[in-house]
A protein has these predicted regions:
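Iron-sulfur (Fe-S) cluster-binding modules
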Residues: 1-65, 77-90, 104-142, 146-244
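Short, polar loop motifs at secondary-structure junctions
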Residues: 94-99
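ATP-dependent adenylate-handling ligase core
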Residues: 68-70
Length: 244
């Protein structure tokens, strides 16, 4: 899930002051931001109180089921079209993708109320850890399911740095070195590093990213004999069954 944190209120106030916004509509997210405790109903109420303390009027609020889902967000904003039209601006308590989706769904100025910090694992309620950089060139098959790109502050791929001491990280001194953990887990599984990992291919993650699942389905649905029809599934093997 995308982990978010509250944006500095002074920045939000400055954004709204810049356009002279006196009325604001608040939009939250029912998924990641709600779980992270940054964009659910309690946080919307806190933002509402802060806006009112600044002398602004909150025309209404809503929580989209998934803020980054364009179709769902457009449907949700249509339900509140009157309140949104009455607002000078929309404050979005969601990740950056959610903010952009709301901005694509309304014609009012849209501002982020949160900062997106990382793609995180839920360790337990209210505790999150960054585990993946979404680099597009995964090495977990070689590192026993521990990502050195993310869990090593220096992003080293082939072993610890010279600053590792007694198995602990030089940078985050209260944490075990990622490469020590990788070595231990490989040993526990009876595995060993068969080769050194090549330097990261950062071209595997070009910005902005885009994946079109429909494109593959449409290609595979073409009649036999068509040069564009491969019949291959997601991993290039047997065709996938369309369960949609």
């Amino acid at each position: 899930m995308i982990i978010t944190k509250a944006r500095d209120w002074a920045r939000i106030r400055a954004n709204l002051d810049e356009i002279g916004a006196k009325t604001v509509f608040i939009m939250g997210c029912g998924q990641c931001a709600t779980v992270a405790g940054t964009g659910g109903e309690p946080e919307i109420m806190q933002a509402k109180l802060a806006l009112e303390a600044d002398g602004r009027v909150v025309t209404g609020w809503a929580i989209g089921e998934v803020a980054c889902h364009l179709g769902g967000t457009r449907l949700e904003t249509r339900k509140h079209v009157g309140d949104i039209e009455a607002a000078d601006a929309v404050l979005v308590l969601a990740c950056g993708a959610g903010v952009q989706t709301v901005a694509d769904s309304v014609k009012k100025p849209v501002y982020p109320g949160l900062e997106s910090v990382f793609l995180g694992n839920v360790i337990r309620h209210g505790v999150f850890e960054e585990r993946c950089q979404m680099c597009g060139d995964c090495v977990l098959d070689k590192t026993a399911g521990i990502c050195p790109v993310t869990t090593c502050p220096k992003g080293l791929l082939n072993g610890p740095c010279g600053g590792m001491w007694n198995g602990m990280c030089e940078v985050l001194k209260d944490r075990e070195c990622a490469h020590v953990k990788i070595k231990q887990r490989l040993a526990e599984q009876g595995r060993s590093r068969v080769s050194r990992l090549a330097p990261k291919d950062y071209s595997a993650k070009l910005k902005p990213g885009s994946v079109n699942l429909r494109e593959g389905r449409e290609r595979d649905a073409k009649p036999e004999g068509s040069s564009a029809s491969t019949g291959a599934g997601m991993y290039g093997g047997a065709p996938q069954k369309d369960c949609s």
